[in-house]
Amino acid sequence: MTMKLLHLDSSVLGPYSVSRDLSASIVKTLSEKTAGLDVTYRDLAANPLPHLSGLTLAAAMGNYDASNDDATKADLALGGEVLEQFLTSDVVVIGVGFYNFGIPSQLKAWIDRISVAGKTFKYGAAGPEGLCGGKRVIVAISRGGIYSQGPAAPLEHAETYLKGVFTFLGITDLEFVVAEGVNMGEEAKAAAVKGAKDSIATLKAA
């Protein structure tokens, strides 16, 4: 059975992005270790998804009839496509820039499209239950400063947020590759990237 990998990038820095470099290295490593890996790529910065509108959300919840609203119908169709792409993937690799203590808004727009009650989680008698337990998610994060420890640690809202999101969706096979301090000089950046790539080299096959 062919394994499907969804590769997402969210940094707006293009070729200057460390997280893009790391996510590409992850996909390359997994492809080398996994025969016939089927990779789909989506650049959330170059081709950003629209943020959820009130009408789209209302229509999705059954509170608004969008049958005569072409714009909302198109937005719903796009959301369905993004959701299906996620649901049919076995592995998801995400490159994440760290902006103002959190994730890029482009990535948040994607998360809003895949966090769908009845599809990726459900509400039961005991509360919410994730429905995506069979997936593996690998997140590559680049941070300009040091947020894993020290006085800035309480300001880290990217890795912690994504752990919360994917755990909520039922995903327990969740890995983070982090390069931090990349804006603290060339020596610090080189050491951070090398450490991250050393970790990537040890990743198991898809």
What is each of the regions a protein language model found here?
Residues 10, 142, 179:
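Cofactor-binding loop segments of dinucleotide-utilizing enzymes, especially the Rossmann-like FAD-
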Residues 6, 40-42, 138-140, 175-177:
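Hydrophobic/aromatic beta-strand patches that form the interior of the parallel beta-sheet core
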